[in-house]
Amino acid sequence: MAHMAHIIQGYIHVRTRATATQEGCSMLEREIEKKLVDGIRNQGGRAYKFVSPGNDGVPDRIVILPGKAPKFIELKTETGKLSNLQRVQITRLKDLGQDVRVLYGLEDVKEFLEEMQHGI
């Protein structure tokens, strides 16, 4: 596969913000989120909106696919940054053994969907 995943401070970057910024891409976070939701649905799964009252900073979506462990997904634009609270929540989930991904932009979403499709 053409991309490399990096584990940094308890969460996974499928790609760095610097790389995404260099590509000059620009897409709103809600558009990126729609691509993820539609792509997971096309694979027979669900990408539930994760809302947890009293727990600000939790990832945006919980992805559930047939026969696979859940994935917690935080979506950002190509130039987006995690807040300190998001970093804390991601670390908490990782400490519980959960698969947490931070996806920056449409290309990261496409790579994630390909990974899920092909079981990489």
Residue ranges and their predicted role:
Residues A2-I120:
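Catalytic phosphate/metal-binding cores of nucleic-acid and nucleotide-processing enzymes, i.e., regions
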